[in-house]
Amino acid sequence: MPSASDHTRAPPAKSSDDLAGLSVLLVEDSAAVGEAVKQLLELLGASVSGPAATTAAAESLLDQRLPDVALLDFHLRGGERSDGLIAQLRQQGVPVILLSGSFEFPTPSSLAGTTILEKPVSEAQLLAHLGPLKPRRW
């Protein structure tokens, strides 16, 4: 019978600067998921504010710094949704990408055209969607 040690594991992610210069607001109510996404973003060179578990915590972070992009969980604890925060970010010109554990929820019309990534999100997905948003340095 094979043991767990017999299975090949993927090598740990190496630090890179693929997203260097990109500031990201991360809103995720699961501490474990939030920390995992934050670590991956930082390994890719992004500067991360959060993870914020509530929209109030996210708004507090926005008072300190306007990000280049926001990664948001739509359904937060206690029935809280992030659509009000999404509207606020869009008014300020901040692109929004949703992270969802399920595509089984009805999508409000206010989210039309919004990129939705299913969790767990991969390094390749983050690079594909965040890379083009990286500030240009001349």
Could you describe each region identified by the protein language model?
Residues 1-23, 56, 115, 122-138:
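Non-catalytic signal-transmission and effector/linker regions of two-component phosphorelay proteins
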Residues 21, 66, 82, 90-96:
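His-Asp phosphorelay/catalytic-motif detector in bacterial-type signaling
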Residues 28:
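Conserved acidic carboxylate
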Residues 31-50:
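Two-component/phosphorelay signaling modules centered on CheY-like receiver
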Residues 51-69, 77:
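Acidic, metal-coordinating helix/loop segments flanking the phosphotransfer/catalytic sites
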Residues 72-90:
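Conserved phosphotransfer microenvironments
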Residues 99-100:
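Hydrophobic/aromatic residues positioned on beta-strands within the core alpha/beta folds
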Residues 110-117:
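As written
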